[in-house]
Curated annotation (Swiss-Prot), chain B:
Residues on Lumenal side: 53-55
One GO cellular component term noted in the UniProt record for this chain: oligosaccharyltransferase complex
Residue intervals on the Cytoplasmic side: 1-31, 77-94
Protein's name in the database: Dolichyl-diphosphooligosaccharide--protein glycosyltransferase subunit DAD1
Length: 759, 115
């Protein structure tokens, strides 16, 4: 990568916004259209510098871009602290825009110059360290290769894209997946996405992240905008990042000693995911750098990478993956995302540094195996991670016999080192046979198997060596790969018989032949004094004895009570004898018809069978008193939870009430004594002579009587509708009032009578 | 002998009546009131005997109100009676005020218990 040396024209601390830079010097920038090896195309990350140019010379497109950058506040309005990531985002977006618009750039005065803003940290004091957002990505776009389509997830991706409510980030991931897998995108899909992309690019209020994703999508879809307004066409403009060293150093400063990276200077947590991101960022910085980055720094980063590989985790089957150690990160990235981010960072970094990274080959292999082994993940984002990583590994050509996505392997010798039966690991049947290569199918095959290969389970061990020695550094091969192989065949079952024997003498009462291959059934009958015997013989096609994995005999009663027995074997002969005398209690004394079912099965047996042989009428004695009942059979779940019997509630019979007339009669009777009282009073000659006549005492007396009447009325109301609390509350007031009035009245009366007495 | 007892009883009754006529009117009023209350209670008991005591609380509250008010009236009579040396210094108005207050409290409780 050839970079021109130029002086940096902006410094960290400026007192005034840089609109016109010192002398308006031009930084040559070069846009890269590398047609690299293997037909890949990579965007280089170009940095741009702003010049002071009069606005009217700008075309509408660049004017909009320029206005985007005119205002320093606008550039950083999304974050008060301008950080490298945002600046880089912006630069990358501009560069990608330029390149995607076929590299047309604006120029002035015949020179190749660019009018888009540089980083001016104008009014802001640049922090010494920069924060890295967690989703900062710069990824090269690689060539794709045909791959087997996985219908479901791809349909999912395209369907959700078609629904037009996607975010640009999701669109980018989806399109990259499609691109790697070589799937064509439908026309209306592309149109819809392009519309959104262009809308984002043209609007001045897009965040840098939106711009980044928009340009990523644009790069894949190659949406072209009709307003191509750059004045002149040039294919070479040099752009780069000034002060790359400082940026590099700052990013590097966030690294930890165990190879992981911190997200920001404020956040002490470190993560492997961030390490991947940081490596990508560093590679971007290096590619953008105007001058050579100090080799010492690069060496330090390589050390970090080695340390990072020390933290790799593995499963037992040889797959490797990266995972986070801490669980309290703000966004927990799974092993998929973490590993893919790390590999992305590694590939980006290795593509920009001059010498090669020495990475442990088996670990890369393990990572590839991990990703191939997880099948198709359900989440679109995981799928993107998987496919992206496989594409990066593919690009770096670091995988085994078939490269990860199925491309051609270089000339190899594949040796079958050993093949042995899994049960007899010491004797290997085949040793050191070299497999021949069929160039048409690109397959290695072994011509002739020895005749002594019988059915069964074997393990084949393969070893691969790259023939061409110079390519050995490019490709990493696994050491010895073990592949389990099952050799299946038809097992012969013959001489099947079922017999009922008398237990005492052992003589055969009835014996019937069974045709296990056919469909016929037999029926026998027995009582509890007899035995039932089933026998047959099994042998492999080559005549050896064969012991199947499963050989069961099952008796099922009419009431669905089942009993299962294992058929024992000796050599080729399989036999089971059921002695009903001993089994009477096990069968719960249930007499009747039992269906017989025979099951013989094994993985290598191509004619496994599960068959109803027939039935046996069993006559068992009566169960004694304390015999165990058969276990309750499972009930149909619908009846178990269905509606139960209805319960009718019996209400308490109401008490007998007296007839209404009687009650009314007695009510009248009860009131009568009151009248009797009044009449008696009159007969006694009650008078109101003592009632005070003068005004004030008279009113008090009246009020006193009224008060008492009011209290009694309150009681009546209390009985009718009031509750105790309101009654008490009212009673309080009334009572106090009555006390006062009564006291007045009665004291007046008392004084009056005292006067009368004394007088 | 029966005749003499009969005559004695009559003589006793007559003397009782004549003595009673000498009591002050206020006391007679109070006596009348007591009689009225007791009579009401009796009628309620008879009713309960006929129809059964289903809402027993109502029966109790009815009977007890009558009995309670009769008791209070008796207390009033004792306190108001001038011949009673014990309550000589208690003004009758005060006794009456007590009577009214206690009745009111009694009837509150009765009303609550009546249901």
């Amino acid at each position: 990568m050839h970079l021109k040396k130029n002086r940096t024209i902006f410094s960290r601390r400026l007192d005034s916004p840089v609109v016109a830079t010192n002398g308006g010097s031009v930084i040559k920038a070069k846009s890269r259209w590398q047609i690299g090896p293997h037909g890949t195309r990579s965007f280089s990350f170009i940095a741009v510098e702003r010049l002071a140019l009069p606005a009217h010379t700008l075309s509408p497109r660049s004017r909009s871009l320029a206005t985007l950058t005119d205002d320093p506040h606008q550039l950083f309005k999304y974050d008060l602290n301008p950080d490298v990531s945002q600046v880089l985002f912006f630069w990358i977006s501009i560069s990608a825009l330029l390149t995607s618009l076929d590299g047309k750039c604006y120029y002035r005065n015949g020179q190749e110059s660019i009018t888009i803003s540089g980083a001016y940290f104008g009014d802001f004091d640049l922090p010494r360290r920069w924060d890295l957002p967690s989703d900062f990505r710069l990824s090269p776009i690689c060539c794709s290769r045909p791959f087997q389509t996985r219908g479901r997830i791809l349909r999912q991706i395209s369907s959700f894209l078609l629904l037009f409510n996607f975010s640009l980030e999701e669109a980018y991931e989806a399109l990259r997946t499609f691109e790697v897998l070589g799937i064509e995108k439908t026309a209306e899909l592309s149109k819809a996405i392009c519309k959104s992309v262009l809308g984002t690019l043209e609007s001045s209020s897009s965040t840098p992240k939106d711009l980044f994703h928009a340009l990523g999508v644009n790069g894949i879809l190659k949406c072209s905008s009709k307003e191509e307004t750059f004045e002149d066409q040039t294919s070479k403009t040099d752009l780069h990042l000034s002060d790359a060293e400082g940026t590099f150093r700052s990013i590097k400063a966030l690294s930890q000693s165990d190879g992981r990276w911190r997200y920001s200077s404020n956040n002490p947590e470190s993560s492997t995911f961030a390490a991947g991101i940081a490596l990508e960022a560093l590679s971007g910085v290096v590619s953008l750098a105007s001058s050579e980055i100090d080799q010492f720094m690069i060496g330090a980063v390589k050390n970090d990478i080695v340390k990072l590989f020390d933290s790799i985790e593995k499963y037992d089957d040889g797959t490797f993956y990266f995972d986070e150690k801490l669980v309290n990160m703000r966004e927990q990235q799974g092993p998929l995302a973490t590993t893919s981010s790390v590999v992305r960072g590694l590939t980006a970094f290795s593509s920009v540094i001059t010498e090669s990274l020495n990475l442990p080959g088996d670990k890369i292999l393990g990572i590839a195996k991990f990703f191939l082994g997880i099948g198709i993940p359900g989440d679109t984002k995981n799928f993107f991670d998987q496919v992206d990583l496989l594409a990066c590994l593919e690009n770096n050509r670091q995988v085994k016999v078939n490269t990860v996505l199925g491309s051609h392997a270089p000339p190899l010798t594949v040796t079958l080192v050993r093949a042995f039966s899994s049960s007899a690991r010491d004797n290997s049947i085949i040793e050191n046979q070299e497999l021949k290569f069929d160039p048409q199918d690109a397959v290695y095959f072994l011509d002739d198997l020895p005749a002594s290969f019988d059915v069964g389970e074997y393990i084949f061990v393969f070893k691969m060596l790259v023939q061409d020695s110079e390519q050995q550094t490019v490709y990493a091969t696994g050491t010895l790969t073990q592949v389990p192989i099952y050799v299946t065949g038809l097992i012969k079952i013959e001489n099947a018989k079922i017999a009922v024997l008398d237990s005492d003498l052992g003589s055969v009462e009835t014996q019937k032949k069974l045709d296990l291959a056919g469909e016929s059934t037999v029926s026998v009958s027995a009582n509890h004094l007899q035995k039932l015997r089933l026998s047959f013989q099994m042998s492999t096609p080559l005549g050896n004895a064969f012991k199947p994995h499963q050989a069961f005999l099952r008796l099922r009663h009419e009431t669905k009570v089942e009993h299962t027995f294992v058929v024992g074997s000796s050599g080729k002969k399989f036999e089971i004898t059921l002695d009903f005398l001993g089994l009477v209690e096990k069968f719960f004394y249930l007499s009747g018809r039992y269906d017989i079912q025979l099951t013989v099965g094994d993985a290598v047996m191509e004619n496994s069978l599960l068959r109803e042989i027939g039935y046996v009428e069993l006559d068992l004695p009566e169960p004694p008193e304390n015999a165990s009942r058969p276990p309750p059979q499972p009930v149909d779940p619908y009846t178990r939870y269905g509606p139960k019997a209805e319960i009718t509630h019996i209400f308490r019979a109401p008490e007998k009430r007296p007839p209404e007339e009687l009650s009314l009669a007695f009510l009248v009777l009860t009131i009568l004594p009151l009248f009797g009282f009044i009449i008696g009073l009159l007969r006694l000659g009650v008078n109101l002579k003592n009632f005070p006549t003068s005004a004030v005492p008279a009113t008090f007396a009246v009020i006193f009587h009224l008060g008492i009447a009011a209290v009694l009325l309150l009681y009546v109301l209390f009985w009718l509708k009031l509750d105790l609390f309101t009654t008490l509350k009212t009673l309080c007031f009334l009572g106090v009032f009555l006390m006062v009035v009564g006291h007045r009245t009665l004291s007046h009366l008392a004084s009056a009578s005292a006067k009368l007495k004394s007088a | 002998m029966a005749r003499s007892t009969g005559k004695d009883a009559q003589a006793l009754f007559h003397s009782l009546r004549s003595a009673y006529a000498a009591t002050p009117t206020t006391l007679k009023i109070i006596d009348l009131y007591v009689g009225f209350a007791v009579f009401t209670a009796l009628i309620q008991v008879v009713y309960m005997a006929i129809v059964g005591s289903f809402p027993f609380n109502s029966f109790l509250s009815g009977v007890l109100s009558c009995v309670g008010t009769a008791v209070l009236a008796v207390c009033l009579r004792i306190q108001v009676n001038k011949d009673n040396k014990e309550f000589k210094d208690l003004p009758p108005e005060r006794a009456f005020a007590d009577f009214v207050l206690c009745n009111l409290v009694l009837h509150l409780v009765i009303m609550n218990f009546l249901g």
